[in-house]
Amino acid sequence: MSNNWFSSTAHRPLTTAMIGFAAAYALHAIDHFRRGMAASPPSIMVGGTIQGIVVLIAVVLVLRHHPRAPEAAIAVGFGSAALFVYAHVLPTFLPDFQDSFTSGPRINVTWFSWVTAVAEIGAGLLLGYVGLRARRRRTTRSPERVTSRA
């Protein structure tokens, strides 16, 4: 199951961060269903669906210890955090592409909406950071890496 790009023990933080992020994503999706499908613009719903597919691919890569798992974690983690800040935290300046919790119309936004959005942003940042560390660890332990001294 493992391509042995680094030990299973070293891979554990990436797996844990990915599962945590996937859980935060799922809770946020539940909040969208709770708020009602009409609460968000169609572009947000389409974007969330595309994000769900990308998250699923990243989960599979991480759980299979694929060599590109750290890069997937970096892209999904930091990308999701940035998109969530834009879509839910910033004031509305492109209403067709935002579901802002800070400016109108805020349809059915509750404390649970805020908790799930902040959890996904935080989990995304953590996933991206853990992905960076995993990639750095893989690069420094790579047997192909040759250093020459001049």
List the model feature ranges, each with a label.
Residues 1-22, 129-138:
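Cytosolic juxtamembrane helix and N-cap/initiation of the first transmembrane helix
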Residues 102-123:
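Individual transmembrane alpha-helices with interfacial aromatic-anchor signatures
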